[in-house]
């Protein structure tokens, strides 16, 4: 299995001029990133690599279909992966123009030509029903204000038999993270309650999809569903 976490770290170091504090935390490639990852999320290098690799594992290495990523953020996690999927048709959507601009810069710097960018709302996706073979969502649902619409829309645009995969914060798995979410992330507007627990997420996805796997890496809920 390809260690996609290592690919992401290498890309971050090569394109450091585009990166920001968020990228450093995700990749653990900066001192502040390692400190925050350890203190807030309780992650060491091994656990950080695990949630990234687990969340991306459902994407076949030779994937050649249509993939939607929502939200794309800065693209620090996914652009190194998309670079290897040159036969795929990839669409990246984000509500934040600033975040998406960073992702576009990263794609251009890496000469990724099969990715298009769309500014939009996950609660009202501008795509036809059953448009994508894979819908990928990394660290988005804990921030989405209308989570019910987000679940409904990501399901709607996914083809029958398609894959819905990714990860996001779930409550009651790691007390220290829960404390920081309540006292820092929510007040600052980074995260928006209510939050899923591992059990509630598993129950929800099992009702929606033909098959659903949910597990946790500390406070990261990682999921893979088949429609």
Residue ranges with predicted function:
Residues 1-35:
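N-terminal, positively charged/glycine-rich alpha-helical extensions of SAM-dependent methyltransferases
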Residues 16, 25, 39, 45, ...:
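C-terminal alpha-helical "lid/dimerization" subdomain adjacent to the S-adenosyl-L-methionine
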Residues 42-64:
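Conserved alpha-helix/loop element of class I SAM-dependent methyltransferases that forms part
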Residues 66, 161-163:
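Short glycine-centered segments of the SAM/dcSAM-binding site in methyltransferase folds
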Residues 66-124:
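Class I SAM-dependent methyltransferase SAM/SAH-binding core
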Residues 123-134:
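A short acidic, Gly/Pro-enriched loop at the edge of an enzyme's catalytic core
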Residues 134-146:
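A short SAM/SAH-binding and catalytic strip from SAM-dependent methyltransferases
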Residues 148-160:
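A short glycine-rich, Lys/Arg-flanked "PGG" loop and its adjoining helix->strand segment in the class I
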């Amino acid at each position: 299995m390809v260690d996609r976490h290592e690919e992401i770290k290498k890309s971050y170091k090569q394109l450091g001029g585009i990166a920001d504090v968020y990228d450093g935390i995700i990749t653990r490639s900066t001192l502040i990133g390692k400190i925050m990852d350890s203190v807030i999320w309780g992650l060491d290098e091994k656990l950080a690599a695990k949630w990234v690799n687990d969340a991306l594992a459902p994407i076949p290495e030779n994937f050649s279909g249509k993939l939607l990523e929502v939200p794309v953020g800065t693209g620090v996690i996914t652009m190194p992966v998309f670079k290897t999927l040159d036969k795929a048709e990839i669409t990246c959507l984000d509500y934040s123009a600033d975040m998406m601009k960073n992702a576009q810069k990263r794609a251009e710097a890496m000469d990724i030509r099969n990715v298009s960018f769309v500014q939009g709302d996950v609660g009202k996706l501008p795509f036809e029903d059953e448009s994508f073979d894979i819908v990928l969502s990394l660290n988005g649902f804990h921030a989405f204000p209308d989570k019910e619409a987000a679940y409904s829309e990501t399901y709607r645009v996914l083809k029958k038999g398609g894959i819905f995969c990714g990860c996001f914060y779930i409550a009651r798995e790691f007390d220290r993270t829960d404390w920081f979410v309540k006292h820092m992330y929510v007040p600052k507007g980074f995260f928006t309650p209510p939050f899923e627990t591992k059990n509630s997420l598993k129950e929800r996805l099992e009702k929606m999809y033909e098959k659903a796997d949910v597990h946790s890496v500390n406070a990261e809920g990682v999921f893979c569903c088949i429609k």
